[in-house]
Amino acid sequence: METFYTTCRIENVVNRRQGTTIRRLLVDSGSEYSWIPSPALERIGVGREKKDVPFVMANGEQITRNVGFAIIRFDKFFTVDEVVFAEKGDSALLGARSLEGLNLRVDSRRKKLVAAGPLLAA
């Protein structure tokens, strides 16, 4: 699958006026979590709720990162999700859990996010 980038707004879950726009988020449905640059999360007051969470990178390297909670907005869609405090050298990613929470799917042919349709009730 070819990759593409999107823009999302990230907001503090307690004070939605504290927010920032991330302009180059790699859409990565192979990554479970969304990775947001630490300085951006710190600037809007997102707390580090889970510390030293272990992750295995695509190359097999094992690392730890902190995780917090944020509102993620794309167009008219929004969700509350766990976000990883990405460090220098980490990619900024919009991951599968956020895509599911936003009820969006990847249109790889057109390289864009589209509404996933009605939610399953059962």
List each model region and its residues.
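Pepsin/retropepsin-fold aspartyl endopeptidases
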Residues: 1-122
